[in-house]
Amino acid sequence: MGRRAKMVEKVKTLMEKHDQIRNMGICAHIDHGKTTLSDNLLAGAGMISKELAGDQLALDFDEEEAARGITIYAANVSMVHEYGGKEYLINLIDTPGHVDFGGDVTRAMRAIDGAVVVCCAVEGVMPQTETVLRQALKEKVKPVLFINKVDRLINELKLTPEELQGRFMKIIAEVNKLIEKMAPEEFKKEWLCDVVTGKVAFGSAYNNWAISVPYMQRSGISFKDIIDYCEQEKQGELADKAPLHEVILDMAIKHLPNPLQAQKYRIPNIWKGDAESEIGKSMVACDPNGPLAGVVTKIIVDKHAGAISACRLFSGRIKQGDDLYLVGSKQKARAQQVSIFMGAERVQVPSISAGNICALTGLREATAGETVCSPSEILEPGFESLTHTSEPVITVAIEAKNTKDLPKLIEILRQIAREDNTVRVEINEETGEHLISGMGELHIEVITNTKIGRDGGIEVDVGEPIVVYRETITGTSPEIEGKSPNKHNKLYMIAEPMDESVYAAYVEGKIHDEDYKKKTTADGEARLVEAGLDKDQAKKVMSIYNGNMIVNMTRGIVQLDEARELIIEGFKEGVRNGPLAAEKVQGVKIRLVDATFHEDAIHRGPAQIIPAVRFGVRDAVAQAKPVLLEPMQSVYINTPQDYMGDGMKEINNRRGQILDMEQEGDMSIIKSSVPVAEMFGFAGAIRGATQGRCLWSVEFSGFERVPAELQPKIAKQIRDRKGLKSE
């Protein structure tokens, strides 16, 4: 039996021992060394050859990733590590650090219980470090810290032992500050990264060595020894004495929770059902014999097997051939194959039990974030939807060069939308174009070139990238009458800005898009009140949609309940296109204050009520001082001081705002905010301005009001592009 086959047998045995499982991720800012770390962990565990590790990037098994040298999708692998005389199963997920692929990070966080946060010793804590940490803590995923590229501090920056320790302390303090700020209340102190107990490791993933304080005490290696090994170019010897995989996986096993421990506090966070029900208790206990409950964290498309769903099981067991039920899409499915991940390969196993991460085929309608259960015991409600820190801010129009490819293109676009719920796909019925919205230029490029071009074999024409704008209101409208086409039904409404605290709760994912069939559910009402909505209004919310809300403030109108669903539909249609540039509306509250209906139901059907509400909502929004909002990005530039002026000039030329500046040694760090519309071509420009000597990164930071003097011009450009008549 080969080494790999033995590994598979061990994995099968350990899957049943909860206290010996760790579901963990590796996450970091782009290029801080996540994938190199993952590869060397695999090599140490005997999954790939040691000679190739670091160069092989086994988890970057997509051609596009290998070519760009960055991780685009989150990859999964299971491996075994021995610690304290016992073997442990480690299910490892490597996540992307590039801001355009943040959706994959969010989805991966749902699958794991602990994370190794990788931070480059040279660059320190960067924006994406903060973002991935925020996502981890939001999902109650416990972090430990690995400070990477320590050899560069010694060989390139020539730091003394005192300076080295100072640099480490600064990074640890910054990470701990973020944990204190963002961790759930009960873990703010417990989850701090403490050097002495070994929750922090230092090393070089590329050169395959790492140390931690407990390991130094055990092995007798000191900081001075490390400096000597690095200066004498003997990092190979250091890797034999302090192997990376041993130090990092020991830290993970000692400090990250097993599924049994983690599910006790994670389940109430991601599932809002009855904690006292059988399924509630079973998930908290991670019971393999309980009712089935799992969540799809990723869809991977395989040329031979079709769509493969990566799934974290919280309760129960899945065997090959089992009937399953998908709660979100309300579809039945069958588990055709049940496997574990081994990098790019999958190894079939007879069954998978609670607490593990597995690969399932046969779930054709599943999307990332989908809840999986048994058709005989349906999980109501499903798991909380995955909320992303970024939003799609750039749209391109694509058309198939050959019309015969059109059906295939539509199928591929559907598949992409299922795989990645940060992509929006829309079909413009009038022009026949397909619109794809993504997180940034790179995200869109990977979709059009790789997913459609390379994998789908379809040649497409891609339009110029278009920035996604939004509309909102700054005032309150007068009472507006919405009249049905037959003039027999009238609804009276007022548009006003949504309460700031309520909208902030919506953006943070504390309240969701939801239709309330009869009246607001008790859980929904409690969340709204907690977010700051008036208690009387919270009871009467009819629907929340795309960050807008409609509240029924009428009294004693009998027919209103019958017309409820039609009113909600009219409201949704009304906020899909704003009055300025037909962009989506956000942050609007519609108060329905009165209504009169025809007593005969035949005269108050969908063709009458929906348009009455739609026109009323649009009119109310138009009379409430509407404004355009544009997407913004936080831009961080790390540049030698000589080029600081050039970096600032580049920001200022793009309508940017400098928020903060710091000096660190001979480097300057510029923090700024720039509209997405002004960021095209920034990569080349900033490289040119600083002669390629700067590091920079961007992150979506929300929508802000377009300057008043630019609004008419931008609104006109959007209207002209959409073929709408000018205002």
UniProtKB/Swiss-Prot annotation:
Protein biosynthesis found in the keyword field: yes
GO molecular function: GTP binding; GTPase activity; translation elongation factor activity
Residues annotated as domain tr-type G: 19-260
Main location as per UniProt: cytoplasm
Any Pfam family: GTP_EFTU
Cellular-component GO terms for this entry: cytosol; ribonucleoprotein complex
InterPro entries: EF-G-like_DII, EFG_II, EFG_III/V, EFG_V-like, G_TR_CS, P-loop_NTPase, Ribosomal_Su5_D2-typ_SF, Ribsml_uS5_D2-typ_fold_subgr
Keywords: Cytoplasm, Elongation factor, GTP-binding, Nucleotide-binding, Protein biosynthesis
Coiled-coil region: none
Subcellular location(s) of the protein: Cytoplasm
PROSITE patterns on file: G_TR_1 (PS00301), G_TR_2 (PS51722)
Residue positions, PTM Diphthamide: H603
Amino-acid positions noted as binding GTP in the UniProt annotation, renumbered to this chain: 28-35, 94-98, 148-151
UniProt keyword Transcription regulation present: no
Job of this protein: Catalyzes the GTP-dependent ribosomal translocation step during translation elongation. During this step, the ribosome changes from the pre-translocational (PRE) to the post-translocational (POST) state as the newly formed A-site-bound peptidyl-tRNA and P-site-bound deacylated tRNA move to the P and E sites, respectively. Catalyzes the coordinated movement of the two tRNA molecules, the mRNA and conformational changes in the ribosome.
Family to which this protein belongs: Belongs to the TRAFAC class translation factor GTPase superfamily. Classic translation factor GTPase family. EF-G/EF-2 subfamily.
Full protein name: Elongation factor 2
Originating organism: Methanococcus maripaludis (strain C7 / ATCC BAA-1331)
Gene: fusA
